[in-house]
Regions:
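Iron-sulfur cluster-binding cysteine motifs and their immediate structural context
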Residues: 1-17, 21-37
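Iron-sulfur-associated redox domains of electron-transfer enzymes in respiratory
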Residues: 34-209
Length: 209
């Protein structure tokens, strides 16, 4: 989804599905994932109550780090609280079960991945009607947090996938920002916060099973 204009590579918006493949394959390394760390810092210093929604895959990036340690670090970094995106996934899963029991559709395509949803809508439009009408887990989690802490609270997602940035752009009233784990790591490094102490309790995480 890249074209060359005036000797410069540019993304073709109507063809882009935010998968990040162009970042990997561009021989000139001209494409970069948008960095939103400065926007996050502004949000944290704005006086707003900012809550972090953490993808469960943090355990794969922050090796050996306990959730209590990550929670404590984010609270010290300025977040009002921390919760796991899996809470939203639990809610969506329950609704999916009911949807499958009630629908006459031969297939139901998950709405969890924004890159997959965009790909279907742009390249396989005949399957678009089969995309689940339910929100993605991160959007469901944002709604849960706002219901608890108020509509004026802000939610920032941290996860492994840059495509979530498109959800933040499209549903900014629910999700203020979406950043990948390296950005979270940079934030903690800049604030000289170590992932070694537990000062604050977790706000609650999804049950195992």
């Amino acid at each position: 989804a890249i074209r060359i204009i005036g000797g410069k590579a540019s993304v073709i918006p109507e063809a882009c599905v935010s998968c990040g493949e162009c970042v990997k394959v561009c021989p000139a390394h001209a494409k970069k994932i948008r960095r939103d760390l400065a926007r996050l810092k502004d949000l944290l210093s704005s006086g707003a109550k900012v809550y972090a929604s953490i993808a469960p895959s943090f355990t794969g990036y922050f090796k050996g780090v306990k959730i209590e340690e990550l929670t404590s670090a984010l609270v010290r970094a300025g977040f009002a609280g921390v919760s796991e995106t899996a809470h939203g996934a639990e809610s969506v899963s329950a609704h999916v079960s009911r949807l499958l029991a009630q629908t006459s559709s031969p297939i139901v395509i998950s709405s969890a991945c924004p890159a997959a949803v965009d790909m279907i809508r742009k390249y396989l439009p005949k399957f678009a009607p089969f995309i689940s009408p339910l929100p993605s887990p991160v959007r469901a989690h944002c709604r849960q947090l706002k219901e608890i802490y108020g509509d004026d609270s802000k939610v920032v997602f941290f996860g492994p996938c840059a495509a979530k940035k498109t959800e933040a752009d499209t549903y900014s009233n629910e999700l203020s920002l979406a950043l990948i784990f390296p950005a979270l790591e940079r934030l903690l490094e800049e604030k000289d916060i170590k992932l070694t102490e537990t000062l604050e309790p977790s706000m609650g995480f999804a049950e195992e099973g």
